[in-house]
Amino acid sequence: MKKIAMFTMGTRGDIQPYIFLARGLVKNGYDVVLGSHPCWKDLVERAGIHFEPIGPDIDIEKEAAAIRGKNQNPALSMLKTMNFVFRIIQDSTHEIYEVCKGQDLIVVSHSQMGATEAEALGIPIVNVTLQKEMIPEKLKPQTFKDKLLGGMIGKQMAKPYNKIRKVYGLTPVKSSDEILSQKLNLIPISKYVLERNPYWEDHHILTGYWYEEDTDYTPDEKLVQFLESGEKPVILALGAMSFEDTSEKDKLDMFINAFQRAGCRAIIQGFQKTLKDYELPDTMIACGSVPHSWLFGQGCFVIHHCGFGTAAASMIYGIPSIPVPHVLDQMGFAKQLCDMNVATKPIHAGDLSETAIYEAIREMQISFDEKKKNAEAISEKIRKEGGVAEAVRLIDMNLK
């Protein structure tokens, strides 16, 4: 039995695709271990996947929210978050190295966690990339300015990896691109959502989204009664973006007031801390942790931060979106959904207000039929792709 280790860091939306891939690999006879933050142990093990804790035992979603709360500029916020993750990876390299021992293949996320340790052990890697901007355009003709700027950025990005490479006696790299697999990079996005970049090399492959239907989920009676009592509700699912303690109640107030102005019923996911002491109107209900595969089918449209996970789920399950992006990659996904006419114009975090939310809801209500039709048409195509099966097939080929 071939053994595969995969490593990733981040919020639940960053972890979930790897759980789906791991389950697909296990079903096809592989022995798989997933390494990530200790806080994700229960989530991974409930999915039947062997888990290895990597790094400090922290609530990564709240830690990331704290960084965002201190840095309102999206670019600076992303840079600070990356530095935070890099420190964890550097400090955890010996843990990662031990997990890599004896494996036949290492699956490496966009953080390149495990790539250097695999190289030190002579183990091949496969990359997974969630953001298209992270994929090098090696086939694009380079101007002098491109080369100069690319060299400066590459050198800066390589610094944290070179610190790890030094631990294992590996030669420094000039760019983080040199760490990437030259055989296979899996992009778990649908070709119906993202057009393949002609400047990518052949080993960068769009597989289709990775997901599963959560057929075992049963909603509680209170939620069922709410859904049966009126029209389909708006779903508010900000995930980790609802954790900023200093502004959480004010943010929730904005949404509730806007929903009432627009005459909307709503299901609210997230805001756990504030909702403990918050009396919601009868037209709204808090749902806690509910799988998107079930939840998104119950709503008319979804308001979300447009991270990889929720952007993917909105397309898979054919539900229009109001994006509220906080950081750069979310802004990219929000623009993509808007360009496909399955989402309204995004409300950027710095512009969030009751009026902005209300106006976005009105925009959605006016154009809903068209956006819903588009979302359902794309969903129908996506659900025929079999992204996990394609990723497993490509990994099979890579190991032969």
Where are these regions (language model features)?
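Nucleotide-activated sugar donor-binding and catalytic core shared by glycosyltransferases
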Residues: 2-34, 39-51, 107, 142-143, ...
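Conserved nucleotide-sugar phosphate-binding/catalytic loop shared by glycosyltransferases and other
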Residues: 33-78
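A short helix->loop->beta-strand "cap" motif at the edges of active sites that frequently abuts
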Residues: 49, 121-124, 264, 319
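Short, charged, surface-exposed secondary-structure boundary motifs
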Residues: 60-67, 134-143, 215-218, 296-298, ...
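Short glycine/proline- and acidic residue-enriched helix-loop micro-motifs
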Residues: 73-84, 147-148
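Conserved nucleotide-sugar donor-interacting segment of glycosyltransferase catalytic cores
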Residues: 86-151, 192
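Donor-nucleotide binding loops and adjacent catalytic segments primarily
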Residues: 195-300
